[in-house]
């Protein structure tokens, strides 16, 4: 039997470990006393360490296929696994106290790991049906996570996420149905051989449907409307997760799909348009925000635009995939650092309330500066390397105008991040609010750690680049 025709389930050990840990967390929550549910967190953290370990071991070996060629285990899958599991560990450290105070602690761990499993399935999918399964496995737990805060804003955000997810899920399935109807195949290698002979208009309709669905998961235009509301209304756990982890699977999945699309279809132009609109709209909308989390919600929309740039030149530049993977890793730790600062200061829900932070909490202010300037793309942070290499990939792939748009939008984004940074270094208010001055210590520590990781990834970019190439 051809290796690609074998099931080889052990190649998906990371995904099975993630999903199995979610099941254990869900069941344990029904039997453990409320005071003992911290064991679920220990088990979940151990599972993430296992996922990272398996991913590293499999990345050392050659690229392989599992489940009769439906799932690819390669460098992109390995990076997605490591970024996803490491992101979960940081998120749990940020929101550990919040989760322990919740009556749904075990269920929260379960929902996060179920959604993360869907993200990993998306990242390795080489089959349209597996892509659909990964989409819904990643999306459905998100709706519950957003609504866990039990507030009017969270309920509204959860409803928006559900409605948008259902709509774009339908578009995804419609696109998959069209592509299957045209080719009689769902595996990417078969699609690559048959799509070129299919009617271009029908192929375009199918591709647009699939792209729209993946844009919901990534949080980019045209499926971005729910992201700022969810980032603002959800609790710290859900807000940090939904603006970070789902992007990993969705964008790697989109990259894989574009590699099998026919050259006769102008799909790079479509993705380039989505990239420009996402980064521009996200930056312009973020400029007027006063709530830090809502600002970060719009910021994450703009980041999707930058991440779409290397996908635009997939197959046209050798820099495309490495730049995408490096950017995803750098964005993960940098975005978590920014949200960790907001979680450390839960009483400060507008930008002016951060006034004087550098004098009262200098380490937290330093983490905020590194995170926000990192999201801008300031050296020597990891996102700086990501943006430079994505722009270089666009230039190398003959999309020089797109590289120019990246640099212009990067400059524009600096202004609204400075609206947050400048008050932090101003004079503190004479009459301080006790709620505003209270600091959650674990999120503060994670903010400093994640900011340091962002700097470290930028400093050792050379060796890391070799690993993702």
UniProtKB/Swiss-Prot annotation:
It catalyses: a quinone + NADH + 5 H(+)(in) = a quinol + NAD(+) + 4 H(+)(out). One of its GO terms (cellular component) is plasma membrane. Keywords: Cell membrane, Membrane, NAD, Quinone, Translocase, Transmembrane, Transmembrane helix, Transport. GO terms for molecular function: NADH dehydrogenase (ubiquinone) activity; NADH:ubiquinone reductase (non-electrogenic) activity; quinone binding. Its EC number is 7.1.1.-. It comes from the Bacteria. It is a multi-pass membrane protein. It is an enzyme of class 7 (translocase). The chain crosses the membrane at residues 9-29, 40-60, 76-96, 105-125, 128-148, 162-182, 201-221, 234-254, 265-285, 294-316, 327-347, 365-385, 402-422, 448-468. Belongs to the complex I subunit 2 family. This is NADH-quinone oxidoreductase subunit N. It comes from Mycobacterium sp. (strain JLS).
